[in-house]
Regions:
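A membrane-interface helix-boundary motif in multi-pass transporters
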Residues: 46-50
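Alpha-helical transmembrane segments in multi-pass integral membrane proteins
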Residues: 8-9, 35-44, 66-209
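Single conserved hydrophobic/aromatic residue that forms the stacking wall/gate
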Residues: 1-7
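Alpha-helical transmembrane segments
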Residues: 53-61, 124-129
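Conserved beta-strand->loop/alpha-helix structural units within folded catalytic cores of enzymes
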Residues: 19-34, 91
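Individual transmembrane alpha-helix segments
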Residues: 9-21
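Transmembrane alpha-helical core residues of multi-pass small-molecule transporters
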Residues: 25, 32-33, 57-60, 149
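Membrane-embedded glycan transfer/ligation machinery
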Residues: 3, 14, 25-29, 88-89, ...
């Protein structure tokens, strides 16, 4: 897509290249999960293999971002690199092995029982508030964003996912509000297309945008 514009304008669409990160993860992680499934003898063993593989890849890729942050003045090379920016996905993989969906672990069942509704909602709301504060004080051109910001945001996001998962288990007879289902179905599509469309139309409409 960027090659359809002059070279001097290619940076305008650089934002869309970050989406390739998800494609890389979905393809490579699926292959690794398939490889481990062929060698696991039980569901529990498979879950453990996935957890340790996810943990190892998480630490390796995060440390790659951490170290490279000291070695470059252009943080875009870190942010748009799949190798250094992929670690939050592996954190999510670790969390998925703990919570499960169709096959829930006994430890997660105990965790659901030990959390009150108040605690669940507090963690969910507190994590969201923490992410909002991070967005105000850690810009993308700050060294601290790459040393600690992305890690802190990943931990907060995992806390939100965990609390939402527990909330789901605690409210089996409750239906999600229709507005939340609508946002869940459309938000990613809007994110995927808003930036290239904005750039393309702004070239033709100028200030009318």
């Amino acid at each position: 897509l960027t090659h359809s514009f002059p070279t001097r304008r290619s940076s305008d669409l650089l934002h869309t290249w970050s989406l390739a990160l998800e494609v890389h993860y979905y393809v490579l992680w699926a292959l690794l999960a398939w490889f481990l499934a062929k060698r696991a003898k039980t569901v529990g063993q498979y879950r453990g293999m996935l957890f340790f593989a996810s943990s190892g890849l998480f630490l390796f890729t995060f440390l790659s971002m951490f170290i490279r942050a000291f070695l470059t003045a252009n943080f875009s090379t870190i942010y748009f690199s799949s190798f250094t920016h992929i670690f939050p996905f592996f954190a999510g993989s670790c969390l998925a092995t703990v919570t499960g969906i169709a096959n829930v672990s006994p430890n997660f069942t105990k965790l659901v029982q030990s959390w009150s509704m108040k605690k669940t909602l507090s963690v969910l709301g507190g994590s969201f508030a923490f992410l909002f504060v991070l967005s105000l004080f850690l810009p993308f051109d700050s060294l601290w964003t790459y040393l600690f910001g992305f890690l802190a945001a990943t931990i907060a996001a995992c806390a939100m996912i965990l609390s939402a998962r527990i909330l789901h288990e605690k409210t089996p007879d409750k239906k999600e509000p229709a507005i939340l289902n609508f946002l869940a179905d459309t938000s990613y599509g809007v994110y995927l297309f808003h930036w290239p469309f904005f750039i393309i139309f702004s070239q033709h409409l100028g200030n009318m945008m």
